[in-house]
Amino acid sequence: MSGQPESTRPLRILLVEDDAASRQALNNVAKTLGHQTYVAENMWQALDLVASENQAFDLLLSDISLPDGDGWELLRYLSEAGLRPRRAIAISGRCSIQDLARSQEAGFDHHFCKPVEMAVLEAILREAAEEVPQ
């Protein structure tokens, strides 16, 4: 037995990143693994996507520094609305000890510093997919 589940459901991922190149790279990783991505360039676009879907996403993959807010605030809004994703991953150029602690306090499961090691992200997405009910 390989240790892999027989089948996993694709994750519904809310991807929030204002940098076009980073957004495309992250989207490509998720799509290559077969996941559904809902892409926003800023916090308010992300909140609009969540409102239109009217259900929690499996995973939030968000930059911390956004033009109209930050990833910490976004996760707080989602949590307060009862729409917190099962997993939340912060991706940022902000990588001080204080930033990492703030991400943890906000409820992020991981905080990756840019540039992101895509193999590590792939492993976390695979692990998250195994945890989602069919």
Please name every model-derived segment.
Residues 1-14, 20, 27, 117-134:
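Non-catalytic signal-transmission and effector/linker regions of two-component phosphorelay proteins
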Residues 20-39:
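Two-component/phosphorelay signaling modules centered on CheY-like receiver
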Residues 39-59:
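Acidic, metal-coordinating helix/loop segments flanking the phosphotransfer/catalytic sites
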Residues 42, 70-73:
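Acidic catalytic/metal-coordinating carboxylates
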Residues 48, 72-85, 125:
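Short amphipathic alpha-helix used as the core "switch/output" element in two-component signaling
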Residues 63, 92:
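Active-site residues of response regulator receiver
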Residues 67, 96:
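The feature encodes the CheY-like receiver
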Residues 114:
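A Lys-centered signature of the CheY-like receiver
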